[in-house]
Amino acid sequence: MKLFFILGNQLFPIQHLNSFKDDHIFFMAEDYQLCTYEKHHKLKILLFLSSMRSHADYLKKNKFKVEYTKIDSSDFKKDYLEKVKKIIKSKKIKEITSFEIEDKFFEKKFQNFVKKNDLIWNKIKSPMFLNSREEFNDYLSKNKRPFMATFYKGTRQKLNILMKKDGNPEGGKW
């Protein structure tokens, strides 16, 4: 069995997960550090956590194997990676799958965790973005002075977003 962890900002439609359904346990955890690292409005935290619970319930309803750690769990205040470590030990997991982690600090922390625990980590391109990291790095390597406007113009042209048939932008201006 493998583990697929889903972070709170990765509540993507089920079609992105279906191919992992049969051989993965899906792990989600409400995280104390995420709720407290910055002062957030209580309703924002409530919305965030209720969205996660709803997504986990949806996965369970669709016959996914889900392990979910709630705010009332004795593990709630433990570091997120301690929660992951607990499940990989109890389920004898050697391989983890996830979407790309957008938070660079947490991604680096997770890479170190994977290395330290001798795990295989399969990273999937995040459906959160139109462009892959490789495409963006390719753009940066080709432009001495990168500008987001130039990058997005190229992306619109490549993906034909808000473009007329003649190659000009809808509305006439970039």
Where are these regions (language model features)?
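N-terminal beta-strand-loop-alpha-helix module at the start
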Residues: 1-71
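Surface-exposed, flexible loop/turn segments at secondary-structure boundaries
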Residues: 12, 34, 74, 104, ...
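Short strand-loop junctions, especially beta-strand C-caps/beta-turns
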Residues: 71-72, 101
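Acidic-and-aromatic substrate-binding clefts and catalytic sites of carbohydrate-active enzymes
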Residues: 72-78
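Beta-rich, aromatic/charged-enriched effector core domains that present basic-aromatic interfaces
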Residues: 79-174
